Each structure stands twice: as structure tokens, then as C-alpha cells.
């Protein structure tokens, strides 16, 4: 408790582990994901940081980064990388895009912190309440109409004294310059918009530098790597999923383990479906003679088999 953050970060050490699968494949997919958003040079620098440090934060949900713990975490990661000799111009993050819009980091809208306001914190939604169960990875992007509605709500809250004029002015400027920018609006989904929004946000964090915090949803990266593996018959992932005896042993070993399968009772599941409401639902492996399928029930009560 008596140390500065910089002193504490200087004591952190990361021990690189050997590759289970070729790391260059991951770096290729990182470059391919970020290039359309930021260009080949920035995407390449992001991959180079990962190659040099082999370490990044995976602690955050994929959402426009307004929530205070998210901002603190990303800044700390930035500072740690700089203690390791990086310039901090590009800081990569892996984030989880599967949470719902009603998650506690509030991907449904903006969390506004204002110490001069009566409540100290204000929520300004972009998405309607009826979409609260939708998955962040699957919803459409923040539209100009959504931004206008949020700004109207902000003006009402300002008149009520729930938000200071100074904070309201900063928020309106952010909405006009970032959320309504061509860079953000040409992205069709909230998942893509989040990658651009957070890079633009981080460039406003400091007065002496303008780093880009590059967020990549880990589900997108995982899907791309799985597609690579499935094209190679001998790949580890394909062997685990499609060789029946290996799959059975894996399911048995991991059933009930925290963070893994828990059978038909509760907890997490390895496979998920996504229905037309953009809601996630668990899919469970069902095996019969000579065949395997994934089965579940979506949020509409419909039986689904894959």
C-alpha cells in the first residue's frame, strides 16, 4: 500500500510459456482483424508487440470503455508495457464479446461518472430495454438516432442537476466527434464499433501522448483459428473435437470442472447457439450410434439441433 503504481508495475514479471500451437498463426489473424480498421502499419505493430511480449490483458468485456474498472485496467496494462520497453503507441487487448447488453459494465449505453452530481454516476442508454438480453457480439451498431436519443436524455438529466454542464459538454463533444464519426458509423455491428471507439477514446486519455488501445473480441480470433485448424486434418483442435474416443475422454475429464463443462445442470458450456433475438443459449453434445449432434433450446422455446 505504500508504493506508487509505477513501482508496483515495475515488479511484475511475465514468464513466457512454450507454444501449444504455432503463435505465428495467431499473429497473422491479429493483423488481418485490425488492418481494415487501422491500416497495415498499425495492425503490424500490434502483432509485433504481442510477439515481443507474449502477454496481454484478457480481463475485459467487449464494450465501449466507459466503465471505470475497465479504464483503469487498460491504462495499467499500457503502463506495464512501457516499463518493459514498449513505446505504448499501440496496446493490444483481448476481450469477451459474449456478455449480454445488461452486463454490469453496461454495454447497453454510456456510464457517466460525475462527482458533482447527486448520484455520482449516470446511465445513458443507446439500446432499448427490450434488447437487454441480446449478446454484444451480435447486435447492430450504435446509430445516429440512438445517439440523438441519448443526448436528449443527457440534456434532461442536466436540467435536473444529475450531470454538470462541464460533463455534459464533454459528452456531447465525444458523441459528435467519435460516435457519429464516419470511422464508427461505417461499422455495422457494436462489436466492430467497439474496436474503433476504444481506439479513439484512448487517444484522448493523456495530454502528452495519444496511444491506441486496440481491442479484439476473443471469440472472433478463436473462430478464425478454429477455421485454420479444421482445414488441417492432424490439427490438435480437430483431433479433440472429431475423434470420438478423444472427445469422450475430454468431456469426462472436464465435466464439473470450474469454467468448463457441467453436464446438464448449470454453469458454463463449451458450445453456444445464437438465435434471431441475438440471445445466446447452451448447446449440449448428444451422441447416438455413429453420429453426434449439438442440441439445445433457444430463447423462443424452440428446439435446435446442429
What are these regions (language model features)?
Residues 94-199:
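Internal, well-ordered alpha/beta segment that forms a basic, Gly-enriched binding/recognition surface
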Residues 78-91, 117-120, 207-213:
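Structural alpha-beta junctions
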Residues 58-62, 93-99, 217-221:
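An acidic- and aromatic-residue-enriched active-site/binding cleft used to recognize and process polar
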Residues 66-74, 99-109, 225-232:
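A short acidic (Asp/Glu
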Residues 1-63:
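N-terminal regions that are enriched for targeting/export leaders
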Residues 87, 91-97, 305-306:
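Structured mid-domain segments that build the active-site/substrate or prosthetic-cofactor binding neighborhood
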Residues 193-304:
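Extended, H/D-rich, highly charged conserved domains that either
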Residues 40-87, 92:
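N-terminal catalytic cores of NTP/NDP-binding nucleotidyl/phosphoryl-transfer enzymes
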